[in-house]
């Protein structure tokens, strides 16, 4: 959802004005950690009725990161793109728990985002999130579905917080068009948005029964 804005403010972007006339999905993302990390992390998680109390704060991750530092190991987490919402939500969650996610310094051409960080946030393509975590390249990740549910279902990791607990009704996927196209093709743009609205209503009909046919 942040990509249209990034296309204008990112120093490395081509400065193409993009409009977003329709939001395709809200929330739908989560933060997942490996089983090894969770086994250590859960020692610091508040419990309720013998179950972890959600949402889980990143503060419970601090002792785990401290152990990595003592062993001179880098604690690495994956995210989809520097200007994507998954990166922003991961950074917010970490910072709220007292973990420095790192900063950017465009004035000195340092866009790593890891200045002063306690963790290393690295870009991983969504389909590779699970495999890189299982292989030990990362210790967890922030991504949209289905990559969190798949990791949980296959027993590879634990989802510690969903995106709606960080930003309720936060836009995830949006329909974007270049401003130039929309201005030159107003009728086509209107018809595209109408089609998306009708499709959305169809997907929600009969208690979401049509979604199976759509997939």
Where are these predicted regions, by residue range?
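Pocket-lining segment of extracytoplasmic ligand-binding domains
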Residues: 128-215
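Short, glycine-/small- and polar/acidic-enriched structural segments
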Residues: 1-122, 134-135, 139-149, 156-169
């Amino acid at each position: 959802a942040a990509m249209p804005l990034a296309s204008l403010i990112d120093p490395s972007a081509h400065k193409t004005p993009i409009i977003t006339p329709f939001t395709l999905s809200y929330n739908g993302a989560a933060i997942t950690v490996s089983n090894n990390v969770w086994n250590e992390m859960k020692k610091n998680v508040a419990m309720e009725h013998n179950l972890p109390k959600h949402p889980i704060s990143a503060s419970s991750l601090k002792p785990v990161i401290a152990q990595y530092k003592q062993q001179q190991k880098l604690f690495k987490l994956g995210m989809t793109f520097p200007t994507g919402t998954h990166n922003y939500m991961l950074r917010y969650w970490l910072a709220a728990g007292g973990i420095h996610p790192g900063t950017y310094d465009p004035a000195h051409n340092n866009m790593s985002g890891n200045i002063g960080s306690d963790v290393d946030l690295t870009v991983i393509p969504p389909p590779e999130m699970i495999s890189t975590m299982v292989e030990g390249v990362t210790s967890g990740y922030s991504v949209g579905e289905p990559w969190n549910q798949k990791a949980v279902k296959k027993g590879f990791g634990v989802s510690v917080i969903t995106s709606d607990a960080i930003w309720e009704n936060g836009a995830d996927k949006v329909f974007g068009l270049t401003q130039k196209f929309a201005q030159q093709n107003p009728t086509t743009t209107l018809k595209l948005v109408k089609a998306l609205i009708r499709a959305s209503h169809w997907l929600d009909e009969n208690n979401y029964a049509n979604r199976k046919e759509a997939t």
